[in-house]
From Swiss-Prot:
Molecular function GO labels: ATP binding; triphosphoribosyl-dephospho-CoA synthase activity
PANTHER family for this protein: 2-(5''-TRIPHOSPHORIBOSYL)-3'-DEPHOSPHOCOENZYME-A SYNTHASE (PTHR30201:SF2), TRIPHOSPHORIBOSYL-DEPHOSPHO-COA SYNTHASE (PTHR30201)
Originating species: Salmonella choleraesuis (strain SC-B67)
Keyword flag Transferase: yes
Protein name: Probable 2-(5''-triphosphoribosyl)-3'-dephosphocoenzyme-A synthase 2
Keywords: ATP-binding, Nucleotide-binding, Transferase
């Protein structure tokens, strides 16, 4: 695991070295998620899940491409502290689009991390803003700042009636799902109230970190109105996946390596049903990133 630079005094800290350290954490979060195995329906070290157009190497190349853009989100967040927070998102969009273009170049057109560019871009901009304002940088303050950036986002982008609906607008109108936009605008409640406390508690109990992350993924899958799942399997597919994850948790979750057999079975069922909980995977990346944020001494 890549060490995080420690700085002896605040006076010696240069913002760029801190930005690079936080960017490395976000990069490691993406790698930690994709390498985690076995994951139901998702690309991992064992198989490509319910995907026929992407593989593990695509995610590694994508994460490396995105990594170099993350400090720019922080720099932008630091540069616009005089703007009201709800005005920040407009300036982040060009950065996000450029980062997406770098991802697509690295993967020859495969969408591996578009959701993570959105969430990590928001959180990195929040880091820059809070650092510049000399405010505490914690999981809670980062998610609250991201929520401020996204104020009114779901109303603007999901509730409007276009002649040609986007996938997100269609799922919102049909099923009431707000997806990544709604989670961000609400301050990532699935992470702050559920996944992050759950993951921290398991680690405090001495649970193996990989098993703890797999258990946390199940928790997210059981709670998340995942638009990736709904776009593939509709309301029935989403309901089935949530129920299967909840049943595994009720039976004790992923406590020991012996429990991985249940995840292998769940993975095969997701592949057969063509279901991939990519939204929950994105939230797991956010969870791991926020769990490690205190490693960077600032």
């Amino acid at each position: 695991m890549m060490p995080i630079p420690a700085n002896p005094t605040n006076a010696s800290i240069q913002p760029q070295s801190l930005y690079d350290a936080w960017a490395d954490l976000a990069w490691r979060a993406m790698l930690t998620e994709v390498n985690l195995s076995p994951k139901p329906g998702l690309v991992d070290r064992l198989n490509c899940g319910a995907h026929k157009d992407m593989a593990l190497a695509d995610f590694h190349r994508s994460a490396e491409a995105i990594r170099h853009w993350l400090p720019r989100f922080m720099e932008y967040g630091a540069s616009c502290t005089r703007l009201p927070p709800e005005s920040v998102l407009a300036g982040l969009r060009p950065l996000g689009m450029a980062c997406e273009a770098a991802m697509f170049r690295a993967t020859a057109g495969v969408n591996t991390h578009k959701g993570s560019i959105f969430s990590l871009g928001l959180l990195c901009a929040a880091i820059g803003r809070l650092y510049q304002l000399r405010q505490p940088i914690t999981a809670e303050t980062l998610c609250a700042t991201a929520a401020d950036f996204c104020r009114g986002l779901t109303t603007r982008e999901l509730r409007q009636n276009n002649l040609q609906l986007t996938a997100g607008q269609r799922l919102y109108q049909q099923l009431g799902l707000t997806g990544a936009r709604g989670e961000a605008e609400a301050g990532y409640p699935l992470v702050i109230r559920h996944a992050l406390p759950h993951y921290r508690a398991l680690l405090a109990q001495g649970r193996d970190p990989e098993l703890a992350l797999l258990d946390t993924l199940l928790l997210l899958m059981s709670l998340n109105g995942d638009t990736n799942v709904a776009s593939r399997g509709g309301a029935d597919g989403l309901r089935w996946l949530q129920q299967q994850a909840a049943v595994l948790l009720h039976q004790g979750g992923i406590r020991t390596p012996d429990d991985l057999v249940y995840l292998h079975r769940f993975d095969q069922q997701c592949i057969e049903r063509n279901l991939s909980p990519g939204g929950s995977a994105d939230l797991l990346i956010v969870t791991w990133f926020l769990a490690q944020i205190s490693q960077v001494n600032h």
